[in-house]
């Protein structure tokens, strides 16, 4: 967060309005600033191959929000009387719908997966709606999967930290704020970045998530295998108490999971999605199961704002839309009393209702018995007549 914010200031805010006194910035100035941003080349092309030359609409929105935040602080400090960014016109960036897997595809992926760490990560992302950083930063002291808890459907995880790679300069600037643990550099070389366990970016991300029994048993098996590895490795194992770790106990970075995920997609010939889309699939699937209970789903995903679910995650799958069309047809266009729905075939008797009637009115049973006896006699005479006709021929 610190690195991205300073990058936005350095690449997009300072070059365009950095020299202006805050008191001189008006709503018109902000409108011109937004106009110029759309014609600013992306700073990413200096370091990476990018598909577009100019800054994207979503990036313009990020720049705008950061500048507005700075001017809000200036208002609080009485540097300026009001924030011109609050009255400026910014077109909302359109959220591109992310491709997701349906439940059948995820089941196929899990059945095909042979990588133990990836298998657990996929289960936690889909069943628990966790971000990859939250999964990789999960420690065993925050995993509650005892037999009584599983039996009572009360197995749960406590999400309070995430694994991330950050710049050392950012750590120094923030004085290690919200950092719980800094991992050493195992290569022995001094690097510009370092792996850390840190507080999630929002308070709502700190949460309790209940887990299905199957996932709890998967975690139990993982812990059993991990303890066996610790016993075999001895002093060669560095125990950081991480749920997802390498055989020597070192933390597993996101890029390792992404590499394994890419390999799995190729081997199983699965649709090309990013790992984070499993979290989107999770939210979508849960909204289907709980009939659109946004608050319950938000509790699992840890979103700060509920509209993130309605805007981004509430995918409507084609199969559901087809079912809706079928139900509409049945409910509106083909009511039960329509001519198209009439069935001219004899209706089968309701045996249960008939028995009840006979029990209530014994004389009805006698009448029915006489009718059946008469019908049987008629059928017998008919058969005899047909037999005589056949003999005469």
Per-region residue spans from a language model:
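C-terminal catalytic core of tyrosine-transesterase DNA break-rejoin enzymes
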Residues: 58, 76, 123, 127, ...
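Catalytic-site neighborhood detector that most strongly recognizes the C-terminal catalytic loop/helix
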Residues: 92, 96, 100, 151, ...
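Active-site/catalytic core of tyrosine-dependent DNA strand-transfer enzymes
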Residues: 7, 182-196, 200-270
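Basic, Lys/Arg- and aromatic-enriched nucleic-acid-binding interface segment
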Residues: 43-46, 50-63, 76, 80-140, ...
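N-terminal DNA-binding module of tyrosine recombinases/phage integrases
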Residues: 1-31, 222-238, 318, 330-349
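C-terminal secondary-structure termini that scaffold catalytic or DNA-interacting sites
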Residues: 145-156, 161-206, 215, 247, ...
């Amino acid at each position: 967060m610190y690195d991205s914010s300073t990058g936005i200031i350095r690449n997009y805010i300072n070059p365009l309005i950095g020299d202006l006194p805050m008191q001189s910035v008006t709503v018109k100035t902000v409108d011109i600033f937004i106009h110029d941003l759309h014609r600013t080349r992306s700073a990413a092309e200096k370091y990476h191959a990018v598909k577009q030359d100019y800054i994207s609409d979503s990036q313009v929105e990020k720049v705008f929000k950061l500048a507005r935040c700075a001017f809000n602080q200036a208002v609080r400090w009485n540097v300026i009387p009001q924030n011109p960014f609050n009255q400026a016109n910014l077109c909302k960036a359109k959220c591109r719908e992310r491709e997701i897997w349906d439940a059948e595809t995820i089941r196929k992926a899990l059945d095909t997966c042979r990588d133990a760490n990836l298998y657990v990560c996929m289960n936690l992302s889909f069943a628990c709606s966790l971000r990859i950083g939250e999964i990789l930063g999960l420690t065993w002291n925050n995993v509650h999967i005892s037999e009584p808890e599983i039996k009572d459907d009360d197995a749960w995880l406590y999400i309070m930290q995430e694994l991330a790679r950050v710049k050392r300069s950012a750590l120094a600037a923030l004085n290690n704020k919200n950092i719980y643990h800094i991992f050493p550099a195992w290569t022995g070389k001094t690097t510009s970045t370092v792996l850390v366990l840190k507080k999630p970016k929002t308070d709502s991300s700190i949460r309790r998530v209940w887990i299905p029994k199957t996932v709890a048993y998967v975690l139990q098996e993982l812990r059993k295998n991990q303890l066996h590895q610790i016993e075999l490795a001895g002093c060669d194992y560095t125990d950081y108490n991480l749920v997802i770790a390498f055989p020597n106990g070192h933390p597993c970075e996101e890029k390792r999971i992404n590499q394994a995920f890419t390999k799995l997609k190729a081997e199983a010939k699965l649709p090309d999605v990013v790992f984070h889309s499993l979290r989107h699939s999770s939210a979508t699937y849960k909204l289907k199961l709980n009939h659109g209970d946004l608050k319950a789903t938000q509790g699992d995903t840890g979103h700060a704002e509920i509209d993130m679910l309605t805007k981004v995650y509430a995918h409507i799958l084609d199969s559901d839309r087809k079912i809706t069309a079928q139900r509409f047809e049945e409910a509106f266009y083909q009511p039960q009393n329509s001519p198209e729905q009439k069935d001219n075939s004899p209706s089968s008797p309701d045996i249960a209702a008939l028995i009840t009637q006979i029990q209530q009115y014994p004389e009805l049973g006698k009448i029915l018995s006489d009718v059946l006896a008469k019908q049987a006699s008629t059928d017998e005479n008919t058969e005899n007549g047909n037999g005589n006709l056949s003999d005469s021929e």
